[in-house]
Amino acid sequence: MDEARKLKIAAAAEALTYVKDGMRLGIGTGSTAEEFVRLLAEKVKGGFRVIGVPTSERTAKLCEELGVALTTLEETPHLDLTIDGADEVDGELSLIKGGGGALLREKIVAAASDSMIVIADQSKVVETLGRFPLPIEVNRFGLGATIRAIEAAAVKCGLAGPLNLRLKDGSPFLTDGGHYIVDASFGRIPDPKTLSDALFAIPGVVEHGLFIGLARAAIIAGTDGIRTMNRS
């Protein structure tokens, strides 16, 4: 097993200690979240009771294969806790998420939860967000106009950089909701809130990967052990 996977498992194992029997749980998407699902499934086999809302079809499939009971936000609109990964996390626990393409559902599930705990390895911790390209989920209609509006909004925020339509097997990547994703390489984002507001003002933008004020804590695994970052 490589070192990167060991760190993901370590963070996932620590997060599992926050999950109590009978909880309604939001379950994230991505490689670290999948390690959490595998550990959770082992506890479920031993009689531990949880019911989960997955943030993607991929996560739902893994949960079903491993025997983790699932529900929906229609049936269970209020969740106790969400456990999810992140592409970047800063000292204020603002995040960039969406590398796996599930940012819309991830944000809906996190917002429906009493709290959100992020699991990640040390490489995801940054002083300022933006090293990882920011995923922006957009409606397929009017793509060119939407990209132009994103560029203009970024300039007003003092940002610029390539906007790339995400591809999969040579065709535009489609989210579970049937939307495109534009990956914005703005570089450092010193004011995530201002950029967030500017992006949401664009009609063609469905969602973006800036998660601000949602994470309560981040469990960070490094070669020297586990540390927990808490939002001030």
UniProtKB/Swiss-Prot annotation:
Could you tell me the keywords of this UniProt record?
Isomerase
Out of the domains of life, which is the source?
Bacteria
* Enzyme class, broadest EC rank: isomerase
* SUPFAM superfamilies tied to this protein: D-ribose-5-phosphate isomerase (RpiA), lid domain, NagB/RpiA/CoA transferase-like
Write out the GO MF terms. Answer: ribose-5-phosphate isomerase activity
> Where does the chain bind substrate?
T29, G30, S31, T32, D84, G85, A86, D87, K97, G98, G99, G100, K124
Active-site residues from the entry: E106 (proton acceptor)
Per the UniProt entry, the Enzyme Commission number(s) are: 5.3.1.6
- InterPro entries reported for this sequence: NagB/RpiA_transferase-like, Ribose-5P_isomerase, Ribose5P_isomerase_typA_subgr, Ribose5P_isomerase_type_A
Q: What Pfam families does the entry give? A: Rib_5-P_isom_A
Q: Where is the signal peptide?
A: none
Can you state which reaction this protein catalyses? aldehydo-D-ribose 5-phosphate = D-ribulose 5-phosphate
State the oligomer form and interacting partners: Homodimer.
The UniProt entry, under HAMAP family, shows: Rib_5P_isom_A (MF_00170)
Report the protein's function.
Catalyzes the reversible conversion of ribose-5-phosphate to ribulose 5-phosphate.
Which family does the UniProt entry place this protein in?
A: Belongs to the ribose 5-phosphate isomerase family.
Name of the featured protein: Ribose-5-phosphate isomerase A
Q: Which organism is it from?
A: Brucella suis biovar 1 (strain 1330)
Point out the gene that encodes the protein: rpiA
